[in-house]
Swiss-Prot record:
UniProt cross-references to InterPro entries, sorted A to Z: Ribosomal_uL4, Ribosomal_uL4-like, Ribosomal_uL4_dom_sf
Oligomer status and interactors: Part of the 50S ribosomal subunit.
Protein species of origin: Campylobacter hominis (strain ATCC BAA-381 / DSM 21671 / CCUG 45161 / LMG 19568 / NCTC 13146 / CH001A)
The keyword 4Fe-4S appears for this protein: no
Region (Disordered): 49-75
Any GO BP annotation: translation
Identification of the protein by name: Large ribosomal subunit protein uL4
Taxonomic path: Bacteria, Pseudomonadati, Campylobacterota, Epsilonproteobacteria, Campylobacterales
Family recorded in the similarity comment: Belongs to the universal ribosomal protein uL4 family.
Amino acid sequence: MSKVKVLNEKLEKASELELPANFADVNPHNLYLYVKSYLASLRANTANTKGRSEVSGGGKKPWRQKGRGGARAGSTRTNVWVGGAVAFGPTNNRNYFQKVNKKQKRLALEFALNEKAQNDKIFAVDSLEISSGKTKDAAKFIKNLGVRDALIVKNELDSATLLAYRNLNNCYVIDINELNAYLVAVYSAVIIETSALQSIVKEG
């Protein structure tokens, strides 16, 4: 059973919070499916080329079929002609959506959290609020914790804390409702408010 370190105000270990045993029994394939779906949803789908039916011109046969010694041609807009259509090019009418049901999303999150806990890369703190809203205070907190980059998870995200972390390129701050398996997996450490972690454990 994996345990999460609960830190005090001095960022010293005060206690531990156990994750449910079922978090360790999740098939890792659920995480793969969720990450694949999440990344697919980020695709802009803007690349577009014109096919034979879309390119302008080329309706008239450029020369007669036989008798002039050259290769036959039916249109000046085939893909082998300069200015012609593109064969098998990207189109912007593709749908990259990949469905992942709620249970799989939940299982993926549980697996990701359990992996972080096993590697001692998830920390619980009573409060992550930075009332000053200053980036230097947020940077100092991360430096004292000794992590390269971190996902900051608050129970309720306030504007001052968001302002403090916004300019740090090695941190990303969210509230509990935005937490997902991809974000947990992509950051090297997760720092979460104790109340938020308890709500996750309760649901699990």
